[in-house]
UniProtKB/Swiss-Prot annotation:
PANTHER family: NADH-UBIQUINONE OXIDOREDUCTASE CHAIN 4L (PTHR11434:SF0), NADH-UBIQUINONE OXIDOREDUCTASE SUBUNIT ND4L (PTHR11434). It is found in: Mitochondrion inner membrane. Core subunit of the mitochondrial membrane respiratory chain NADH dehydrogenase (Complex I) which catalyzes electron transfer from NADH through the respiratory chain, using ubiquinone as an electron acceptor. Part of the enzyme membrane arm which is embedded in the lipid bilayer and involved in proton translocation. It comes from Monodon monoceros (Narwhal). Core subunit of respiratory chain NADH dehydrogenase (Complex I) which is composed of 45 different subunits. The gene is MT-ND4L. It is a multi-pass membrane protein. The chain crosses the membrane at residues 1-21, 29-49, 61-81. Keywords: Electron transport, Membrane, Mitochondrion, Mitochondrion inner membrane, NAD, Respiratory chain, Translocase, Transmembrane, Transmembrane helix, Transport, Ubiquinone. This is NADH-ubiquinone oxidoreductase chain 4L. GO terms for biological process: ATP synthesis coupled electron transport. GO terms for molecular function: NADH dehydrogenase (ubiquinone) activity. It holds the Pfam family Oxidored_q2. It is an enzyme of class 7 (translocase). Its EC number is 7.1.1.2.
Length: 98
């Protein structure tokens, strides 16, 4: 395993740790989730480029499209929640009321 792969896996684990530790605000959780998806995108791209598997060249592009959709939906939910409740604290949200 090369140093680049180790750094990308470390970025993924740091984003996962950030998601688990800083989940009081919705914005910080969304940023950590975006970091996880982007590190997975880079790891998938490097793996496909190193393996020279030509049939899977579309997988990183599909993953990038899903990351963009996830970011757009997350920001729309953040705006809706902050307009409705006046804050972005995750503790104030109740799934039974939403």
């Amino acid at each position: 395993m090369s140093l680049v792969h180790i750094n990308i896996l470390m970025a993924f684990t740091m984003s996962l740790t950030g998601l688990l530790m800083y989940r009081s605000h919705l914005m910080s959780a969304l940023l950590c989730l975006e970091g996880m998806v982007l590190s997975l995108f880079i790891l998938a791209t490097l793996t496909i480029l190193n393996s020279h598997f030509t049939l899977a060249n579309m997988m990183p592009i599909i993953l990038l499209v899903f990351a963009a959709c996830e970011a757009a939906i997350g920001l729309a939910l953040l705006i809706m929640i902050s307009n409705t409740y006046g804050t972005d604290y995750v503790q104030n949200l109740n799934l039974l009321q939403c």
